[in-house]
Every structure is written in structure tokens, then in C-alpha cells.
Amino acid sequence: MEAFAVAIQSVINDSGFLAFTTYNAIMILVGLILLYLAFAREFEPLLLGPIAFGCVLANIPRNGFEEGVMALISAGISQEIFPPLIFLGVGAMTDFGPLIANPKTLLLGAAAQIGVFVALGGAMMLGFTAQEAAAIGIIGGADGPTSIYLATKLAPHLLGAIAVAAYSYMSLVPLIQPPVMKLFTTQKEREIVMEQLREVTRFEKIVFPIVATIFISLLLPSITSLLGMLMLGNLFRESGVTDRLSDTSQNALINTVTIFLATGTGLTMSAEHFLSLETIKIILLGLFAFICGTAGGVLFGKLMSLVDGGKTNPLIGSAGVSAVPMAARVSQVVGAKANPANFLLMHAMGPNVAGVIGTAVAAGTMLAMLSNH
């Protein structure tokens, strides 16, 4: 009987209830709210769902996650394994044809990155270090894997807040972008019908990822792992002889890695790291960055329309953020409401895929500037 009592006492002493705090309860509530948004409201459920559940797990006291499979999942993020693998799948799902057919849309993808650098300056004004500000600013590119990659390198203690902000704003693209697009364009500009894009050859689609990888990687070696995997996935897609690799990359692989990446991100959302004034600042700065990025793309689209005599609909500029393909769909929806004869989707895909490259380049630029500081 005494042995039984000792065993019961041991279970009680090891119980998480004894170490459970109000802060743990608050973070578990945050996780449950995110689960509701993911599954009931369908806000980026494939990503926000695992992140939310990881948040719940991270706030169970004495969870023993320092070893075992959870430690391996965390290592996949800290050792920068998962983001490049996500990019492999993204590359296999991406068609660079609209960008190749209309190369000037690359400039729209670049213009949309203004939000990244505006937010960087704003974050530094609010007291964040240069490294922290850079990691926060990249939220404006609306690219979750790149945000995680840069945060891991420059501000790992802010990873949870940055990832949640990035994926939240990606899911809210249809709500955030239209008011900004309408604010900076006239009805006449939104009604512009663009000419059909030319057909892109298979040779062009194969050469593009090779040339882009070599040139950009030589310019910014720090993003070679991200960009290289993106373009390798695209080569699988376009080569015509690696269908099995392409299918695996854009289905089984990316789905599996998404589970680990999102869950691992949630595991960083422990109360001691997440419950702070900095988290609120990060969420607000991320929203500001995303709005500025959308505005930057639209304003550059207006300039492009002015230069080419009204052949470019400025609405496609908002797709310069790298939320693929949601941002391009928003351009299509807003354009079609202004003019039912408008079909902007393929035109918007040009700046949209350019935004993926642009956000990676912005991340590489900041890494080159700050990694040694």
C-alpha cells in the first residue's frame, strides 16, 4: 500500500498541473482560437492548424520536448531544413510562363517589396535591433517559408510571432488587398483590358530557372538554398521527363514537410517567448508592411500604365507580394468587378511569381547586410 502511495505521489509530482501557470493557460487559449480560425473559418487551415496545435503542445509544462521526435522537428527549423524543402514543392507548382512572356512584370514584383523595407525602418524606430527589424519586415512579402527562414537566421526568439503574422496575413489577402487597390486606382484604370500573353516555349521555361539560379545565387549566395530548391522544383515541372519527381514534390513531399514546419513553428510559441509587447508590435508592423507592399505594387503598376500608354492594368501590381496564387486571384476578382470583360489572372501571375523571387532576394539582401553584425 505504501508503494502504491509513493507511486501516486510521484505521478502527482511529475504532473504538468503543478507547473501550470496563467501564462500557459493564455497561450493554450491562443492556440485554441487559432485552431478555430483554421478549421471553422478556414483561414489557411493547412498551415494555421498545425501551428495552433503546436502552440498548445508547447505550453504543456514538463512536456519533455528537448529530445525525441519533437526535438527533431524543432531542429528541422533551426537547422534550416524545412523552408528549402517547402520551396522545392512551391517550385514544382509554379508556372513562370506569365513572367517570361511579360518580363516587365518582374519590376512589379520588385516594387511590392517596398513594404519589407518600410516595415524594417518602422521596426527600428520602435526599438527593435536591425536583425529583428529585418526578420519582421519580411512579413510584408507575404511569404511564410521565407519569413521563417530569415527569422531563424536573424531573430529566432521572434520566430513564433513572425510566422503567425505572416501566415495570418497570407490567409487574409482577399480582405486586406481590395480596399488598398481601390484607394490607389481610378475606375477607368481598373477597367483596362490587357492583351493576351504570348505562348512561352518549353525551351524558355527550362532555361529560365537555370539562368535565374546562377545569376541570383552568385549575387546573393546566402539564399542559394531557398532559390535553388525553388528552381529545381520548377525544372522537375517543366522538363517533361521527371513527372514522378514533380508529382512527389508538389504533393506528398510538400504536404509532409508542411506538417513538420508548421508544427515546429507552433512549438516556438511558448508563453515566455510569445506573451510580450513585442508580439503586438510585430503583428501591427506585419500588417503595415503588407499594406505598403500592396500599395507599392499598385503605384508602380500605375506608373507602368502611364509609360506604356494604358496597356497595363495597375491592379496586377498588387499581386507582386508572393502569396501565390491568392494575390493574383484578388487582382482578377477586383478587375472583373470593374469590367466583366477583364481577365487579369494570367497577367497577375507574372508579378505574383516575381514576388516569390523578389521576397527571397530581399531576404538575401538583408542577410548579406546584417548576418555579420
Can you describe what each PLM-predicted range is?
Residues 6-19, 37-41, 53-81, 235-256, ...:
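Hydrophobic transmembrane alpha-helices of multi-pass solute/ion transporters
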Residues 39-48, 69-73, 93-108, 242-251, ...:
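Interfacial helix-loop-helix linkers and transmembrane-helix boundary segments
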Residues 59-72, 88-100, 122-131, 272:
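Transmembrane alpha-helix boundary signature
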Residues 75, 79-80, 88-93, 108-118, ...:
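Alpha-helical membrane segments and immediately flanking helix-loop junctions
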Residues 99-120, 271-297, 348-352:
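Entry/N-cap segments of selected transmembrane alpha helices
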Residues 157-175, 285-293, 316-319:
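Alpha-helical transmembrane segments
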Residues 168-241:
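Membrane-embedded hairpin module used as a gating/binding unit in multi-pass transport
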Residues 213-300:
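Transmembrane helical segments that form the transport core of multi-pass membrane transport proteins
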